[in-house]
């Protein structure tokens, strides 16, 4: 179980690296899906199934819509893949920064691996993450509205950035 959680953590970091290394949007969406699946699987293996499901729906429902619009509007004749020198340079730079941060922070020698689940203290009649479901929908209404408007604003910003000088449907004939 510990190795599985470490594998999911590694997949999460590699997925984030695949998005952050600035490939073409065609390839960046694959890194986003890998990171979201690995992160939600990581939470699921630790016993937080409801929060994992909510985050998975937010990631795939919100951010993938933005990436789909970016891919549809950014028609590159020669898209940058992960094997191009610029993307590989970004990836190597991120890995070097991560390793230097781990060494300087002193985390390399003191890595104790262990897995602790959410309800490992004893037997509960209701799991701990399901007790927060009511809080999501009662006190979290404002947060959901702000997050929805934020995703809509992000969609419009990405559409405006990708559109360029073509002026969309409002063009002078």
UniProtKB/Swiss-Prot annotation:
Its membrane topology: Multi-pass membrane protein
Superkingdom assignment: Eukaryota
Gene3D superfamilies recorded: NADH-ubiquinone/plastoquinone oxidoreductase chain 6, subunit NuoJ
Catalytic reactions of this protein: a ubiquinone + NADH + 5 H(+)(in) = a ubiquinol + NAD(+) + 4 H(+)(out)
Any single GO CC term annotated in Swiss-Prot or TrEMBL for this entry: mitochondrial membrane
EC number(s) on file: 7.1.1.2
InterPro entries (UniProt xref): ComplexI_Subunit6, NADH_UbQ/plastoQ_OxRdtase_su6, Nuo/plastoQ_OxRdtase_6_NuoJ
Subcellular location: Mitochondrion membrane
Function of the molecule: Core subunit of the mitochondrial membrane respiratory chain NADH dehydrogenase (Complex I) that is believed to belong to the minimal assembly required for catalysis. Complex I functions in the transfer of electrons from NADH to the respiratory chain. The immediate electron acceptor for the enzyme is believed to be ubiquinone.
Family: Belongs to the complex I subunit 6 family.
Protein name: NADH-ubiquinone oxidoreductase chain 6
Organism: Aethia pygmaea (Whiskered auklet)
Gene that encodes the chain: MT-ND6
């Amino acid at each position: 179980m510990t190795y599985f959680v470490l594998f999911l953590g590694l997949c999460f970091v590699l997925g984030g690296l695949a998005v952050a290394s600035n490939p073409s949007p065609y390839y960046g969406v694959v890194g986003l899906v890998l990171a979201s699946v690995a992160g939600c699987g990581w939470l699921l293996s630790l016993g937080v199934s409801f929060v994992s499901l909510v985050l998975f729906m937010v990631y795939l429902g919100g951010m993938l819509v933005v990436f789909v619009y970016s891919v549809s509007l950014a028609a590159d004749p020669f898209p940058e893949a992960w094997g191009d020198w610029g993307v590989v340079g970004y990836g190597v730079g991120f890995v070097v920064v991560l390793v230097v941060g781990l060494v300087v922070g002193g985390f390399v020698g003191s890595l104790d691996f262990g897995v602790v689940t959410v309800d490992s203290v004893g037997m509960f009649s209701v799991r701990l993450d399901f007790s927060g479901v009511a809080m999501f929908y009662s006190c979290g209404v404002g947060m959901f509205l702000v997050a929805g408007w934020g995703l809509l604003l992000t969609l419009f910003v990405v559409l405006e950035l990708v559109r360029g000088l073509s002026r969309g449907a409002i063009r002078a004939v």
